[in-house]
Every structure is written in C-alpha cells, then in structure tokens.
Amino acid sequence: LADTHIRLLHDYLDSHECFPTVAIEGGVCYFRWDKDCIDKCKFISHSNGVVNVTERYLSENSSGIVIRDAGSLSILEKTKSEDNFSKLVSPRNLFKVEIEKLREQEKENGIKVFGRYNRGRGNQFLDNYITKDIRAERFLGKWKVFVSKADGAAGQLGNPIPARIIGKAELGDPFTICTETFLAVGPFNSRQETVNVMKYFTTKFFRFLVGVRKLK
C-alpha cells in the first residue's frame, strides 16, 4: 500500500465485467507500475457500469487496506477522532476452552461456555475456569457480547442480494465465556450497556464501517 510507483489501477467489483464466465469473489483489479513516477495513483473503479475516477494514495486514511469505494473516504476521515471500536474486540480464542472438559449438564457454581454444538448455537458447561491470561481475566464476571469470528459476506457486497455483513450477536452474562468460534466484545459493567452495543451492531453506520473492510 505504501508503493507510490503504482500510477494506474483499474478495480472491478464484479469479476464478470472482465471474465463473463468466471466468478471471482472480491472482484478483479489490474495496475500499471511506473519506476520513474512517485505520485498518487489514478484509481478507476468499475461498478455496475458506473466508472468513478479518483487520484489518491492507496494507503489513504491509514486504514491498512485499500478503500475501494472512494465515497467512503470522507466518512472514514470523520471517524478518526473517535476511539476505535476494535479496542473492545477480543483476540481469537480468548478463553482457550478445553473442549474435552465440557459437559452438557450444568453443575452448581459452574461456568457456561457459549459455542456451536451439534450444528447449532448453545451452552455447555465447565466445572470451573481458571486463566492466567490478563485479557481473558478482564471479561470474567463482566457482561459481554459474543459474535462469530467468521460470518457474514465477503468480497462483493449487495450483489446479487443484500449481504449479511455480520453474524447475529449474542448476549453474554458475567458467568459465561465462549469457545474459539466466537469473539467477545467488552467487557461491560451492566446488562443495559451490553444491550446498547448489540443495538449498535444493527445500525446502518456500523454495518457500513464493517462492510468497507469486507469490500477490500
């Protein structure tokens, strides 16, 4: 992304515009690299017959990805001054649950473990849970939101049908952790605060921000 020798880039969100008989998820792009030129890239986006041309650096707004939709850049620029929501999102496999120790019946003072079991979402149980991971400890005894680490659409969004941007969020009470299938968002001090975050997940603005990263 930091290469300023890429002088021209054509980006096709729908691969069929280049290869009518081939479906390539995420689309197709090609570019011209010029060793004698150090400047902005002429970025030409092709989408549903509409061509949009901008002059910009590929690393525009320091997001770590190429923002394919030029119209999104100004919106993203306005969010820079706000705290990044990703600070609330746990790393993968935060709790490092030992699956072989799970049981289907709940034991008094046990710990619920939210995950996917028998092709569906649900809870199983641990007799106890101890961790030395400071990141995991922060979530113990606190409210949190569970969201699938791999869900929703990827690549080309909204074509041919509106894409599911992110999977359904689940409320996690202070006595519940999750398997590696899910990420934990939080921690939060109250149920109401957690519910508010779940509502934020459903807003068009949040879906837009996540969608921009998926459309990379």
Model-assigned labels for residue ranges:
Residues 4-5, 38:
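Conserved small helical "lid"/interfacial subdomain of P-loop NTPases
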Residues 5-17:
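Conserved S-adenosyl-L-methionine
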Residues 15-216:
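C-terminal substrate-recognition regions of SAM-dependent nucleic acid methyltransferases
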